[in-house]
UniProtKB/Swiss-Prot annotation:
The species this protein was found in: Klebsiella pneumoniae subsp. pneumoniae (strain ATCC 700721 / MGH 78578)
Family per record: Belongs to the LpxH family.
Claim: Metal-binding is one of the keywords in the record: yes
Taxonomic lineage: Bacteria, Pseudomonadati, Pseudomonadota, Gammaproteobacteria, Enterobacterales
Annotated catalysed reactions: UDP-2-N,3-O-bis[(3R)-3-hydroxytetradecanoyl]-alpha-D-glucosamine + H2O = 2-N,3-O-bis[(3R)-3-hydroxytetradecanoyl]-alpha-D-glucosaminyl 1-phosphate + UMP + 2 H(+)
Protein name: UDP-2,3-diacylglucosamine hydrolase
Length: 240
């Protein structure tokens, strides 16, 4: 019995090794799980479910095979792929979740999320996030021709990279009080998230008791997952 969590694969055609590693993961470890949760940034960018990128179809088919094998797959949007919609969800068999979800895993209450909303010190990013999550702005963007959406997405990624290069690492990390607030709001002692690309298990205090925050690593030179069993919560790195 095990439930698996992954995040921040940033899949793109320019990184075939990561894609190959993910496909092997889906054909192996994922098939043995009780469930698979993808906590955002599965893709480096997402400009709409109507994008005919062959990579997207390849990944949808691979995830659907896992679902068809009896392993439910769930998805929380990240800051890179927040426009993943119901069309792709149907193609892949994934179930789209809210940005914060509380799970009961073998008697252990766990809060899961992508993690970007915990970075409350980065006010510039939060303002941008609020803007691009505005429903009418999303509808307007998705109504644009694909080639224009590609250009806008490329410019946004370039601007984000430039902005992040001038920010301190502390600003781009989670705010400790935001973490405690989220855990106390959901009455949990465990939190699993991604986004920061700083894999670790942090011990803290929440709800007047010891609590733990488990941060998933990004898939760069190796894979990263959290494996929850009835007996343990493990942060695991593995080769592609």
């Amino acid at each position: 019995m095990a439930t698996l969590f992954i995040a921040d694969l940033h899949l793109q055609t320019e990184e075939p090794a990561i894609t190959a590693g993910f496909l092997r993961f889906l054909q192996g470890e994922a098939r043995q799980a009780d469930a698979l949760y993808i906590l955002g940034d599965l893709f480096e960018a997402w400009i709409g479910d109507d994008d005919p990128n062959p990579l997207h179809q390849q990944i949808a088919s691979a995830i659907k095979a896992v679902v068809d094998a009896g392993v439910p797959c769930y998805f929380i949007h990240g800051n890179r792929d927040f426009l993943v919609g119901q069309r792709f969800a149907r193609q892949s068999g994934m179930i789209l979740l809210a940005e914060e979800e509380r799970l009961d895993l073998y008697g252990r209450e766990v809060l899961i999320m992508h993690g970007d909303t915990l970075c409350t010190d980065d006010q510039g990013y939060l303002a941008f996030r609020a803007k691009v999550h505005t429903p009418w702005i999303q509808r307007l963007f998705l109504a644009l021709p694909l080639f224009i959406r590609h250009r806008i997405a490329a410019r946004m990624r370039a601007d984000s990279k430039a902005a992040n290069s001038s920010k301190s690492m502390e600003i781009m990390d989670v705010n400790p009080q935001a973490v405690v607030d989220a855990m106390e709001r959901h009455h949990v002692q465990w939190l699993i998230h991604g986004h920061t690309h700083r894999p670790a298990v942090h011990e803290l205090q929440a709800n007047g008791q010891p609590a733990w925050r488990v941060v998933l690593g990004a898939w760069h030179s190796e894979g990263s997952m959290v494996k929850v069993t009835p007996d343990d919560v493990e942060l695991i790195h593995f080769p592609f």
